[in-house]
């Protein structure tokens, strides 16, 4: 519609094609991917929230993440993080239940050695029983602050959690949902695959506390600037 009306157009997406299906269903998917590519070609700009090299009308602005509310030490005191914190999130749905259960299973054997505490954010749909083995935060609206304050993040390979972990310098273990192409592709960027869940204890020991430098967090500002140029 915008094309026919001669309006300026910007598409913001982190997926330029899908690979969910096989067999006959893949024929429909290929047509949808072709339609997506056609839409991209008719836009003035396609904004992708990843790190990459611009080409044609595609602009890579870097991760779009929320600004943390305080410095890391202040956040840890405010939240009550004293030990080495392993933050586990299931991504807000039951899909992450298997990952949370695995983290609960392996942590007791590591707790004394790592002086660690298991903090779980299962989200709104998954109910966990009370236990001395972990601290259950349920659903939170400041996940980005928790990620920044933690010493390790264990999560499904969801875009926002991975981007925030990378931007804030917090090490992460990202296990994709099996046969979910987008999550498998995202996890592979960090060197992980589904089978890594079976060596979770080893990965926790390897990754915890290995912080990296915080990254440029101006993806949203770059996207806004591109959009404003067309107004």
List PLM regions with ranges.
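Nucleotide-activated sugar donor-binding and catalytic core shared by glycosyltransferases
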Residues: 1-117, 125-231
């Amino acid at each position: 519609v915008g094309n026919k009306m001669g309006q300026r157009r910007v598409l913001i997406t982190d997926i330029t094609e899908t690979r969910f299906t096989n067999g006959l269903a893949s024929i429909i998917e290929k047509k949808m991917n072709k339609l997506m590519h056609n839409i991209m070609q008719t836009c003035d700009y396609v904004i992708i929230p990843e790190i990459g090299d611009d080409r044609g009308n595609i602009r890579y602005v870097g991760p779009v993440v929320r600004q943390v509310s305080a410095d890391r030490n202040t956040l840890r005191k405010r939240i009550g993080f004293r030990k080495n914190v392993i933050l586990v999130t299931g991504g807000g749905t039951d899909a992450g239940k298997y990952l949370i259960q695995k983290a609960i299973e392996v942590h007791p054997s590591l707790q004394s050695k790592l002086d660690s505490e298991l903090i779980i954010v299962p989200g709104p749909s998954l109910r966990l029983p009370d236990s001395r083995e972990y601290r259950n935060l349920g659903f939170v609206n400041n996940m980005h602050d928790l990620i920044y304050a933690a010493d390790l993040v264990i999560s499904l390979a969801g875009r926002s959690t991975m981007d925030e972990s990378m931007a804030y310098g917090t090490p992460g273990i990202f296990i994709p949902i099996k046969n979910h192409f987008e999550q498998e592709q995202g996890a592979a960027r960090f060197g992980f695959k589904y089978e890594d869940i079976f060596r979770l204890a080893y990965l926790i020991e390897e990754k915890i506390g290995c912080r990296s430098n915080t990254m440029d967090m101006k993806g949203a500002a770059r996207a806004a600037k591109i959009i404003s140029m067309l107004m």
